[in-house]
């Protein structure tokens, strides 16, 4: 896991039993609406968690007022309490306010017959300045290789294969758990054998998520894939999943296992390591090799080219250094995927 986030327990079954029944009913109706438009259960659970925090705050500090009757002053009071008393981060406050805003939009558009005068006031109240509270680790290509070497030396071939897939494919940890062994057969090689192209894999997205063909740098990933598959054959590990659940190989590995692995890797690396850092490392490495942003966008599967800049950890100076030197402008040959 690597990074530490302050966890502040606000709700409890005892407190939730005391919240205004109208607030509970409103939340339940909202949840039914979310399911009717195919929002994912993980998204819905996030809404429930946020709203329950708001209801308990209202119980303890706002006279247990029905949400429809909240004023901007109530929003300010809750925000101030979260920031200065409960020590929540600005990002956490923004997320909770986003959930309240979504609920407000639902009331305004769906419940207008019951509450014709209701208006969404959440974003009328300025949010605290967003600033990172967790340490961000920027992994260099050398650090990634050191991690892979150490895991291989220790015989942790499953972990090495996972890191290689994260570092040379840029997928999220939950997505990596969904890869099958068949996604890395010779028939999956494209672009002159430089990339593996998987069958469609469920990725993060609205509703049930979207399905994408995921690309992985074949030459860099294959040695770690081969070692893991050899280990599996020697130890009788049979499963369609690349990373099977140890207790039930018919199922894929759980994200909780990945989090445990990241704690092990953090100890080996000597710096906080979390799975998403490899997504940044992959994007940065492609940029370092001179691939245009529009190509990186297609490889990772982003809809917007702006995502490349978000995940690219290269400094402005590093970028300029690729194109300018002692003799002025450098002439660079265009990098091909087959060169990687």
Regions found by a protein language model. Name each.
Residues 111, 166-192, 294-295:
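Short, charged phosphate-coordinating catalytic segments
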Residues 13, 28-134:
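N-terminal core-binding DNA-recognition domain of tyrosine recombinases/integrases
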Residues 217-271:
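Active-site/catalytic core of tyrosine-dependent DNA strand-transfer enzymes
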Residues 300-325:
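Catalytic-site neighborhood detector that most strongly recognizes the C-terminal catalytic loop/helix
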Residues 141-173:
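Basic, Lys/Arg- and aromatic-enriched nucleic-acid-binding interface segment
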